[in-house]
Amino acid sequence: MVVKVGINGFGRIGRLAFRRIQNVEGVEVTRINDLTDPNMLAHLLKYDTTQGRFDGTVEVKEGGFEVNGNFIKVSAERDPENIDWATDGVEIVLEATGFFAKKEAAEKPLHANGAKKVVITAPGGNDVKQLFSTLTTSILDGTETVISGASCTTNCLAPMAKALHDAFGIQKGLMTTIHAYTGDQMIVDGHRGGGDLRRARAGAANIVPNSTGARKAIGLVIPELNGKLDGAAQRVPVPTGSVTELVVTLDKNVSVDEINAAMKAASNDSFGYTEDPIVSSDIVGVSYGSLFDATQTKVMEVDGSQLVKVVSWYDNEMSYTAQLVRTLEYFAKIAK
């Protein structure tokens, strides 16, 4: 049985999700909705500065485009309630516009023309279950109509924090994500809505201090860590490829080897482990939501207790997208 998917919003995440889905058996994209001209969408699908060329054929046709010989209808509806998902058999909508990230707004397609489920490609509200790895799919029972893939940074931080907490118990911690610049930053200094003076500065020429939603989201995806972690972001001049540092105090004293062993034992298809001396360009295109770097683990003795630092890499584009597609695939299997 093939599960048919619609993508609402064909930006960075929407396009990369489309690429990933091409290799998922039993899942097929039959409708894309985006306000951009289909010629532009097809071109941006085919050519990608950071992720490389699409491994397939893309040809613009009337009403959409043909990918690897399969026609995908493209619409340009501003309101999701006006999208005729049923005509193309869409069962699950990947909500990737960024404008409908709350449950009430994300549910619009469910009340219009046949869609049954929605996966939000952004942190949802407190009333939406958020998943960060294949391990957390157990929180779903199949009756959910809307779920969230959380954020790229949460998908990096959470499995590392969970593995550390499960093994040794986290008391308190501070995280910093050193994050690639993104499309909501300026290329050159200029006026920007929202009043964020730092984001008004050139993203590819500056280290830009910023906030991160992961500091709050961690308590939603791992309730036992609620209120225990805080943090911030530093946007840096690379197009993709990011890293999260977590400094914590633990319930017990540990060694570097013990920490790395616990992380290696916790590794899976969502949470990778490496002992190679990698740099940010080495993780572009990686499918792990979080890739733990054992070479950067540090333990510092402080008056009989310890400060522990752990580090995990992520491609803030593809790592997150790979997680979303895994979530979507599982969601499709258990849908009731």
From Swiss-Prot:
Originating gene: gap
InterPro entries: GlycerAld/Erythrose_P_DH (IPR020831), GlycerAld_3-P_DH_AS (IPR020830), GlycerAld_3-P_DH_cat (IPR020829), GlycerAld_3-P_DH_NAD(P)-bd (IPR020828), Glyceraldehyde-3-P_DH_1 (IPR006424), NAD(P)-bd_dom_sf (IPR036291)
Chain sites annotated for binding D-glyceraldehyde 3-phosphate: 151-153, 182, 199, 212-213, 235
Main subcellular localisation: cytoplasm
PANTHER family: GLYCERALDEHYDE-3-PHOSPHATE DEHYDROGENASE 2 (PTHR43148)
Pathway info: Carbohydrate degradation; glycolysis; pyruvate from D-glyceraldehyde 3-phosphate: step 1/5
Reaction it catalyzes: D-glyceraldehyde 3-phosphate + phosphate + NAD(+) = (2R)-3-phospho-glyceroyl phosphate + NADH + H(+)
Active site residues of this protein: 152
Family: Belongs to the glyceraldehyde-3-phosphate dehydrogenase family.
CDD domains (alphabetical): GAPDH_I_C, GAPDH_I_N
Annotated site (Activates thiol group during catalysis): 179
Origin species: Streptococcus dysgalactiae subsp. equisimilis
Something else known: Binds human plasminogen.
Listed Pfam families: Gp_dh_C, Gp_dh_N
Purpose: Catalyzes the oxidative phosphorylation of glyceraldehyde 3-phosphate (G3P) to 1,3-bisphosphoglycerate (BPG) using the cofactor NAD. The first reaction step involves the formation of a hemiacetal intermediate between G3P and a cysteine residue, and this hemiacetal intermediate is then oxidized to a thioester, with concomitant reduction of NAD to NADH. The reduced NADH is then exchanged with the second NAD, and the thioester is attacked by a nucleophilic inorganic phosphate to produce BPG.
Subcellular localization, as worded in the UniProt entry: Cytoplasm
Keyword Aminoacyl-tRNA synthetase annotated: no
EC number: 1.2.1.12
Subunit (UniProt): Homotetramer.
GO CC terms, sorted: cytoplasm
MF GO annotations: glyceraldehyde-3-phosphate dehydrogenase (NAD+) (phosphorylating) activity; NAD binding; NADP binding
Main enzyme class: oxidoreductase
UniProt keyword annotations, A-Z: Cytoplasm, Glycolysis, NAD, Nucleotide-binding, Oxidoreductase
Protein name: Glyceraldehyde-3-phosphate dehydrogenase
Entries under SUPFAM superfamilies matching the protein: Glyceraldehyde-3-phosphate dehydrogenase-like, C-terminal domain, NAD(P)-binding Rossmann-fold domains
